[in-house]
Amino acid sequence: CRNEIVALIDEHLTDENVAKELAYFTAPFRASFERPYGYGWLLALAQELKQSSLPQAAVWYQTLEPLTQDIRNRLVDYLSKLTYPIRVGTHYNTAFALALGLDYARAVQDSGLEQSILTAAERFYLADTRYPAHYEPGGDEYISGALTEALLMSKVTDNFPAWFDKFLPDVETVVALMNPAEVCDRTDRKIAHLDGLNLSRAWCMNHIAKALPENHPG
């Protein structure tokens, strides 16, 4: 199975294919294509290739680099003109892309990108208090606006526990967050996004818990 996966990546991750992807992004009227969700995942892929122990990964990383740098620059430009964060629990969520982008920036020691993300995160989220998490989830969301923001800020602020206590002061009582979302029809491709919400919530909670003291009431 591993050999098949490696062969498949070798087949698809080529200079020619990356050039086609880059051309698609840089064509007229595509400035907002896959922004910011696709940006975050592309940078996450680059990070995985950078940190992978597979002997082929270094070649894949270099092959992807032209597209990676283009997306990196697009993210910086986007953050420079984004007046307000997007908090919806779908592809447009700002905090989700910033969390992935920040991990990439630190992995490759891109201080310029890191600072751009830190500045944006603090501008958007540092003053947030009493987030209305009891209104979650939306009917076809797969990201928790509350938990994804908290995940990002656990990577941003030095005093995360204090920030978190103001952001979600009664988190343990928020039934909507503390219980899995109900998926009533998995044949409906939009409603089935709620399965993804349960997974992404668990991912966020795992990271958030590690950033809080063991005796934290949440």
Regions found by a protein language model. Name each.
Residues C1-A105:
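Extended ligand-binding groove/face enriched in aromatic
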Residues V108-G112, S116-G218:
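Long, repeat-rich segments with strong aromatic
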